[in-house]
Amino acid sequence: MSEEPKEKPAKPAHRKRKGKKSDANASYLRAARAGHLEKALDYIKNGVDVNICNQNGLNALHLASKEGHVEVVSELLQREANVDAATKKGNTALHIASLAGQAEVVKVLVTNGANVNAQSQNGFTPLYMAAQENHLEVVRFLLDNGASQSLATEDGFTPLAVALQQGHDQVVSLLLENDTKGKVRLPALHIAARKDDTKAAALLLQNDTNADVESKSGFTPLHIAAHYGNINVATLLLNRAAAVDFTARNDITPLHVASKRGNANMVKLLLDRGAKIDAKTRDGLTPLHCGARSGHEQVVEMLLDRSAPILSKTKNGLSPLHMATQGDHLNCVQLLLQHNVPVDDVTNDYLTALHVAAHCGHYKVAKVLLDKKASPNAKALNGFTPLHIACKKNRIRVMELLLKHGASIQAVTESGLTPIHVAAFMGHVNIVSQLMHHGASPNTTNVRGETALHMAARSGQAEVVRYLVQDGAQVEAKAKDDQTPLHISARLGKADIVQQLLQQGASPNAATTSGYTPLHLAAREGHEDVAAFLLDHGASLSITTKKGFTPLHVAAKYGKLEVASLLLQKSASPDAAGKSGLTPLHVAAHYDNQKVALLLLDQGASPHAAAKNGYTPLHIAAKKNQMDIATSLLEYGADANAVTRQGIASVHLAAQEGHVDMVSLLLSRNANVNLSNKSGLTPLHLAAQEDRVNVAEVLVNQGAHVDAQTKMGYTPLHVGCHYGNIKIVNFLLQHSAKVNAKTKNGYTALHQAAQQGHTHIINVLLQNNASPNELTVNGNTALAIARRLGYISVVDTLKVVTEEIMTTTTITEKHKMNVPETMNEVLDMSDDEVRKASAPEKLSDGEYISDGEEGDKCTWFKIPKVQEVLVKSEDAITGDTDKYLGPQDLKELGDDSLPAEGYVGFSLGARSASLRSFSSDRSYTLNRSSYARDSMMIEELLVPSKEQHLTFTREFDSDSLRHYSWAADTLDNVNLVSSPVHSGFLVSFMVDARGGSMRGSRHHGMRIIIPPRKCTAPTRITCRLVKRHKLANPPPMVEGEGLASRLVEMGPAGAQFLGPVIVEIPHFGSMRGKERELIVLRSENGETWKEHQFDSKNEDLAELLNGMDEELDSPEELGTKRICRIITKDFPQYFAVVSRIKQESNQIGPEGGILSSTTVPLVQASFPEGALTKRIRVGLQAQPVPEETVKKILGNKATFSPIVTVEPRRRKFHKPITMTIPVPPPSGEGVSNGYKGDATPNLRLLCSITGGTSPAQWEDITGTTPLTFIKDCVSFTTNVSARFWLADCHQVLETVGLASQLYRELICVPYMAKFVVFAKTNDPVESSLRCFCMTDDRVDKTLEQQENFEEVARSKDIEVLEGKPIYVDCYGNLAPLTKGGQQLVFNFYSFKENRLPFSIKIRDTSQEPCGRLSFLKEPKTTKGLPQTAVCNLNITLPAHKKAEKADRRQSFASLALRKRYSYLTEPSMSPQSPCERTDIRMAIVADHLGLSWTELARELNFSVDEINQIRVENPNSLISQSFMLLKKWVTRDGKNATTDALTSVLTKINRIDIVTLLEGPIFDYGNISGTRSFADENNVFHDPVDGHPSFQVELETPMGLYCTPPNPFQQDDHFSDISSIESPFRTPSRLSDGLVPSQGNIEHPTGGPPVVTAEDTSLEDSKMDDSVTVTDPADPLDVDESQLKDLCQSECAQCWASVPGIPNDGRQAEPLRPQTRKVGMSSEQQEKGKSGPDEEVTEDKVKSLFEDIQLEEVEAEEMTEDQGQAMLNRVQRAELAMSSLAGWQNETPSGSLESPAQARRLTGGLLDRLDDSSDQARDSITSYLTGEPGKIEANGNHTAEVIPEAKAKPYFPESQNDIGKQSIKENLKPKTHGCGRTEEPVSPLTAYQKSLEETSKLVIEDAPKPCVPVGMKKMTRTTADGKARLNLQEEEGSTRSEPKQGEGYKVKTKKEIRNVEKKTH
């Protein structure tokens, strides 16, 4: 049919005839239809209208669109063709293109503004047409560009309907998934389920039988149907086998969903189809919970009728009743209660439904519950009743209801809060008013003594305060520490509350227990307005705290300028003196508050004011190097020469601290440079003592006497020599110091250096003419002193130069140490402001709580002839010591450290003159308490001075000094033992009839005394401490027992003595007063153990030691010093000191008797006459159960009596014995137990009859044992000895469980340990910390010292529990670098190295880098509840030092290892191959082992010789040693070398940190299971390849495993080569249209959607051909990557399955191996290699064929014959395609591939030949590893003839993942282009024969096991410029050389082709 167009086309410029015009129009349309662009354009140029159309309305755009001529369409649109022009049928170009499936045209049209939702005459849209014709891409594009699928045809059919009718399942899926109504993209079947579209669902299920398709969150269509209540689809799905109980994410089933949504019909359907009514989600919700929570009555009723579990609880213990109550669903609550749900059912926190109703304020529900007799006084775990909660949440109606039903108005919580406390704190005046109306007292106190008024003041509730004080609340009520509400509000700065309280008569001068008034607190916090109010109401300016601080002192301390100014205006005394005579100016100077100091000076404060010991503010400023304050003080007339009582001037302090500028300032203000203190010390002496050369220079330049002498005659040179300070010694000698000057005792500097063992100093002195023959007053030369003290190197140096006079001396003579004087004054700046009670909520602000008034007493001990040392008996930092405080930010220095901060004491470094002087010389040995040394002394030993100027390189730094003059491992708050050789032993010593006494050198407190005449002959006594697990049979431990020290191995074992000998062993058990005791076990052979019994009284011992110069401590002293004394007449092989619960024991026989406990006096066991038939030792143990422990673990669920044990266990008595045990304390209910013989169902008697080392098994025996109550005790009878325990528990059934839980905590053995913290500042912001909890470890951790850590804190001994975690928190200016929410934690194990390494950052770099570490038993709670730390340590980080050369000298191994696992910070660089993974895992373990490697070696059963050999082979690097050990272990143990094995051994040596690493995310890649052996993954540890001279080189090549030639132009480290794991090759798009058979001619069912027919595009008079454009068939090589992968995988499986042996004819070639990585290529290079100028287009055709087969630990499928044939065909095509590429010759005749049986052989052959290209591939596996295409690596002296051997190496039959096994040995350094050329001739014949020989040999040996064809392994894809390329060229026997990468030379190689087809066997 033909029509005239509606519009006449515009006339051309030149009129033509009408006939020609219509011809032109038709020709134009024909040209457009045929795609002849030029022709069409010519017509347009000649005047044809671009929009001209034929009689059907078709224009050029329509025609070109239909035929898919994109260029024509684009050009027409550019020439303003109407994009939305419609045909007669209303079709636009977009309709036509969509119908024809012309995707590119559709894109162009839409881009040019075509209306995607245009509708034709019958309402068809482009989307409808594309959907009808199954044009998936077009449908997708239209949907993405706004096409609406809701637009229907006139008959109401949508695109989805037509796609369903036509059966186009992919289009249906696409349309459903893009249904815009849903918020989340869901799979098609889900959408069908949502729309209840059974038809769509049926079609989708027809094509995919799985009805349980999952969405992203794991929901199935049935879940969706359940959600929307779509019964029809649900029925269909269930009929099609949908799982009725399918669990989605969090274990949600469809029944949960339907119940939650209230779809009752759906619930019924699901239950009818067998849904589990009691299914639980991950949180424990059942369908009943879901229905109840949402209040769906009908559903709840249905579920209850079907017996839903009404008692079921969630993870948190919530029942359906709680849920219904929470949602205020009254009807559901009633329903549940009708079904007899317990009304008082509790959650895990003991919350009832009534608590929930009170919380939410649901009045009606609360009423129903109370009517059903819910308990109004039920207590939650924290003691809150519903009334408390109602008061907290301001629910006044519920509150009144509760009171009406008898709720207790005085009920108290755990912390003693009543409802009025809670309401006052929350600020609810109306509730407070109602409570008081109902009789609540406003003056009731909580456990801290606080009333409601305190609470209101604390939370700043002014209205409540007003109401309370008007209604009779006591304004002056005192809480704990005597705090009044006024104190609290003053501290918090609540001026309005302060005003109210003062007006109501509150005393402004009320003081807390530590003497703080409200004014002090306001001053401390800087609240000027509050201070003004207080002063207006008469607050006193002069009241002092216990420390004598006035409010002005406090303001000065905290730098509160405004308050200080106000106080001074109000006439506060600027010179008020505190307890130690400190003025506010002293305090301001100490805390560097310059503005306050200036204010005080302006207001007349005296700069001359001196503290009691004579310190002026200038002394303090000089000590702390506060230049500004010092300058101000001097300007105000401070005397630079003012001295303290000891004669110390400011310049002394500045000199000692090394403050050069301060010294210069003081000297410029006329300070006397030669001023000496009372003992004669000048500033130069102190500079010499501290090695301050820079200060010494200033002093000497200003006229200091170089040879000034102290009273004892010491010159600065003596002092420098004594302390081993080489730099100052050199300086003094350069300035003509007298080298032979003598002290009063006749000591020269040389004597002093010899006494201290400083060889380096001695050498310098001798070079400077020191006389070695000078004698002391006692006639000793330096040599004699050194010899006596056992300094071998010193003796060797001096004996050459000394003239010796022979003398005889007895061995017992002791050397009296000569020590120069030092200064020891300290000054306490602290002000004890007990803030525990007043400010718990301020803990997080970095404000620190002082630990109270400890240690107020100072003791002076006189030490003859040496010096006076200030010694403290208690913790030096917490109390009122004469100490000078720490850094300014640690305002409340109450920590548990041993004093360890440099300036924390004006002790001018009481360095104790080398502690040796006090321990080695008996006449000066102090008693124990004197060793709680002054802080400076300790600090000097531990921490090099913070201000040390680094310009002077210190040849002998403080670390090295330790080894000269003291034993740093004993630096603790205990007796310092570092005896001379003659009085101590390391392991053994000789003794004879004269007897002897020896102290242990390593372990302080160890001593062996052999009295005279007790040893029969000269004997070598040995004594060493050994680890428990070293013994095959360690001593058996009962629960609650633990070793208190290491095992003591004595020798000679079995030695008999003529009388008792004494062995004293230090122990670490905490005795908890008298609660625990020590017993000694002995073992003669290490196999059996028994208790060591030897009683002897003290008098006997004294008599025994008669004539010996030994003193024995009393038992009390032994207890204090924690020493166990063993008295024995013979030596067993081992002693064990065991800590256990104290046991009362006695011999009891048939006559009977009574045993009573001394620990818990009410506990007793009464044995009647005849209970025992013979006399035996019977024991009674009573272990107290601390209430706080019970509360911490169980809350107020239960209370317990002591645990009582009768020993020996499991013994039956002939008559019952009577046990008496005190009743448990009253329970948390707040009601007295009232045990008066009444029925007490809550009181239970528990019993455990297990004995020996078996764990206790508690059972409830209340029912079978009658209990009798006597006063506060319960007695009962028993005829077996066992463990008994009384419990008072509300939930009787839970008693045993709760008891067992508590018991596990109670049996943890307590130890006394110390916390030590090491730090290293990495950069100005970040530092590394290592925290240790040590028992008997050496404190100078060698690893930390080697890594340049400094000790920054050490605690006194603290009680810790075995095996329990210790949580670490950081406050102040330091923040730990942890993931959010994570807490630092490590476990304590006795005698193990408990190390916690972590990093911290400095919050504010402008402030001092100091903070506090708190060690806690519990994790930090989110509730912010106050927690008591077991230990607090204040730390200041060491200064950031730039590493000097020596520090930088890390071994290459270490660097390589660090780089090797840089992927830890760069996850994308995670290693891929198993060899790589194993190597890195080893590397990480090695890097962390440090010095523990030897311990590990011993645990792994390596001999001493093997360990020494590892040391010798790797002398310079700990990491190399560790790595070599692991390598040897894997080689030796093979398959048994598993991660689990390593973990267990590491746990034994207590390297839990490494175990954590092994189990942590670092090792997650590859999901390596613990049972998999390192050897299985690959034999990384074969001997080094030739050419690698040392193990170090192996460590340098971590990337070898990647088999990746690096990019030649890339200079980066190869550690970063792997930036991406993804393959750069993308999967070719699937031609899905070709795969899906067309269903276009299905008959339409009646009433189905109409099918659009295409427009008739035939043109009048046109003779165009109507042939269809046929798409070219897919390129035979363009194989879909995933298909190929599957095929390859299945082929591999087939290969592996079908290689039982080698056929005789040898035709079977190597089986194909799966590879785990892209062969020879890193991903980064692949990415780069995607394109490039060198790449030929045709390479793409072969790319996909050689994609890697990534078989990642999944089983390959069996390959069918068809698949095998398909694969074979692809390979054939690949060969043909390759031979068709230019320059590629094909050796194989095209007809050579005949049968499937040959497939594998030829594939292998093909790969082999592909690899043997002469272009860039190589035979040597080494060369392809080294990343040098074409270059053979010359290894050592070997030539290229080694290649076949190298090729053979990778075949390891043991494992399946062996690619690149030796790659760890290969060198991967980037090479640069070289220009030389080197010939390495190789005989072609030799190489060919060898290669053939090796290959065939391998095939014969290894064929039954999977291995990789050499060719496949060696394929390289790198061109000279690093671009990816496949080298597949082959030239038989040809020799070629071309430019290669190399270091200055090139290699010419011959490539011999091994053709698998030619192999013969």
UniProtKB/Swiss-Prot annotation:
Annotated ZU5 domain residues: 985-1140, 1142-1289
Any one Pfam family match given in the protein's UniProt record, by short name: Ank_4
Localisation per UniProt entry: Cytoplasm, Cytoskeleton; Cell projection, Axon; Cell membrane, Sarcolemma; Postsynaptic cell membrane
Region (Disordered): 1-25, 1606-1678, 1698-1740, 1784-1818, 1844-1884, 1915-1961
Main location: cytoplasm
PTM annotation (Phosphoserine): residues: 22, 606, 830, 844, 850, 873, 914, 917, 923, 958, 960, 1114, 1451, 1462, 1470, 1473, 1795, 1813, 1883
Positions with biased composition (Basic and acidic residues): 1-10, 1725-1740, 1808-1818, 1933-1961
Tissues expressed in: Expressed in many epithelial tissues, muscles and axons. Expressed in kidney, brain, skin, lung, liver, intestine, pancreas, heart and testis (at protein level). In testis, expressed in Leydig cells, but very weakly or not at all in Sertoli cells or seminiferous tubules. Expressed in macrophages (at protein level).
Positions of ANK repeats: 56-85, 89-118, 122-151, 155-184, 186-213, 217-246, 250-279, 283-312, 316-345, 349-378, 382-411, 415-444, 448-477, 481-510, 514-543, 547-576, 580-609, 613-642, 646-675, 679-708, 712-741, 745-774, 778-807
Cross-referenced SMART domains: ANK, DEATH, ZU5
Keyword annotations from UniProtKB, A to Z: ANK repeat, Cell membrane, Cell projection, Cytoplasm, Cytoskeleton, Lysosome, Membrane, Phosphoprotein, Postsynaptic cell membrane, Repeat, Synapse
Highest taxon of the lineage: Eukaryota
Domain Death per the UniProt entry, residue ranges: 1478-1562
Stimuli inducing this protein: Up-regulated by high dietary Mg(2+) levels.
GO BP terms: axon guidance; axonogenesis; cellular response to magnesium ion; magnesium ion homeostasis; membrane assembly; negative regulation of delayed rectifier potassium channel activity; neuromuscular junction development; neuronal action potential
Gene Ontology cellular component list: axon; axon initial segment; cell surface; dendrite; intercalated disc; lysosome; membrane; neuromuscular junction
InterPro entries, per database record: Ank3_Death (IPR037971), Ankyrin_rpt (IPR002110), Ankyrin_rpt-contain_sf (IPR036770), Ankyrin_UPA (IPR040745), DEATH-like_dom_sf (IPR011029), Death_dom (IPR000488), Multifunctional_ANK_Repeat (IPR051165), ZU5_dom (IPR000906)
Matches recorded under Gene3D superfamilies: 2.60.220.30, 2.60.40.2660, Ankyrin repeat-containing domain, Death Domain, Fas
Functional description taken from the UniProt entry: Membrane-cytoskeleton linker. May participate in the maintenance/targeting of ion channels and cell adhesion molecules at the nodes of Ranvier and axonal initial segments. In skeletal muscle, required for costamere localization of DMD and betaDAG1. Regulates KCNA1 channel activity in function of dietary Mg(2+) levels, and thereby contributes to the regulation of renal Mg(2+) reabsorption.
Record PANTHER family: ANKYRIN 3, ANKYRIN REPEAT-CONTAINING
Stated name of the protein: Ankyrin-3
The species this protein was found in: Mus musculus (Mouse)
Name of the gene: Ank3
